[in-house]
């Protein structure tokens, strides 16, 4: 199987992450599982700029046997460790997006910060964020992948990585990118609101929980969002599907 549609959607996610300035150099990594057990997944190759992502250029790797898989050797080491462990150990993580996008990373770098229920977008993430509060350097040891995967429990789909960035997991590419987009929007608003020094008017927990449920049940919102983004690319940068 060539997983054509998955490749196209993931390439579109890369292109839009670049357009929205979520990327950082040729670092950061997105992946999408293509096997039921999560051991086979598509991921960006080492050194690929997000703005140049193409469906055919994404690496198909098998996490059960890296040493004998030459394709896997062209994948960033930290990407390999994080994504392989999460795909294998978190069944709902069919798509994993990891970025150092500025506003979310800024909040993740505040001591003991908890994401504020400040607006409708923030309420989408009510009780869904996990926090890794200790930065221990780059994820170059397999134990780090195992540790990070263990934090994505109890329905937590977003992981704030202290002094580092954020990781989003979802069942589909459309859902994951929609989460990433609205997370950064909500984080941007929080940074702006905090910068005023004024008292914040927060949404109460009951209302935040209701809004979160409404977000989750809103019909086809994520799919429509990705389809619209792909339509734009089809007109302006159609080479992403090659």
Predicted segments — roles?
Residues 1-242:
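Glycine-rich flexible loops
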